[in-house]
Amino acid sequence: KLNISISNFELKLFDFYSIRNAAKKTFMTVGIPYGHCSSEKEVIKAGMQILKLGADAVYCSMSPEFIKAMTKEKIPVIGHVGMVPATKSWTGGFKAVGKNSSEAIKVYDDTKRLEDAGVIGVEMELVPTKVAEYITNNSEIIIISMGSGKGCDAQYLFAEDIFASHPDHIPRHAKTYANINKEMTKIEKIKHDALVSFINDVNSQKFPEDKNLIFINDNEYSKFIDSLK
């Protein structure tokens, strides 16, 4: 299996430039948000901008036609099959895709269409493990699993889920390795209590204390007052 480190960012391009400089050896893709481009010319321009900033590949969940336009210009593209959030209404919402044979065939066909369009890989999201493994074994491209099992070439999770940095539901296919949201809640209480203590000290004249003050010696202070008379 591939040992590949991929970070996918749908960020403003100047934000990515800073990230690229901080992680020069990491293979990075930058996503073109769905609907951002309305023509092949626009999607090529967006892809070129992303590569110019130092990205290794472009993520795009739009049509094979748009993707082919980019790959013809030698832009490495990663597509998306299975449960694609931007087009989830067509597959029944946020749920697994491919649990019956007709859906599984469509995932296979979608993967092949993207392969024919020239992608270097696809993100395969919420597809049954056996289906994902079969497609992986019968494809020439990199299959990146998002909840589609160990049989794919690489694994992908959102950092927010790995860190549990949000209070929302963690999906079944994800695994948390920390609980930053819990720690942040504690930190926010500490910050709140500190601000309340500061306000109380000011109101009761406990702050500032002598150790917080800057002093002038009596002789210099007298000179200061005399000079103003």
Regions found by a protein language model. Give the residues of each.
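Alpha/beta enzyme core
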Residues: 1-229
